Amino acid sequence: NSQFSILNSQFIYNIGMLHILDKQNTIINKFLAELRNIDVQKDSMRFRRNLERIGECTSYELSKTLNYATTSVQTPLAEAKVESISDNVVLATILRAGLPLHQGLLNYFDDAENAFVSAYRSYLNESDFEIKVEYIACPSLEGKTLILCDPMLASGASMIAAYEVLCAHGGKPAHTHIVSVLGCTEGVDYVLQHTNPEEVD
């Protein structure tokens, strides 16, 4: 059973569940506002840092959906039981725009494996295009939790192309989360139309 989560400026969309971020203001509002501000956008370093910060915030939210197992740690006083993430996480991104967001996720999931895909639009004419994938580096995804990120979910075609090629090279993950910072309805709909949770084990 595969789970797809989409984070954008308005909501976290989780198949079967919709969370409206506007109902609960968070620090993400500030980061998103600066990302969209035409003046602040000119500061490349701040733009990248805000993407990284959003990746960190998203990691915290995503961690609530993962599987945990009880483990033991030796403290200075005694042995303590703690709940630790039991999922094997693989962080994947679409080069190169996704790197700052990927880094934010990696800052929290610091023991995760990494995967990279190079995907771009190859225009056939002024309005039609196809997605070209020229590079992929991917570990085994079998039975693991895949987190695939790209800052902008526009048409959704690049995201689906990246997901399909990752699965073709690494196998089917146990769970998949798709993370974007900004998205449009068309892209969300495209992702939902081209994924079937019941077929992804």
Provide a role label for each language-model segment.
Residues 12-201:
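PRPP-associated nucleotide enzymes
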Residues 1-12:
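Short, basic, low-complexity termini and linkers enriched in Ser/Thr/Gly/Pro
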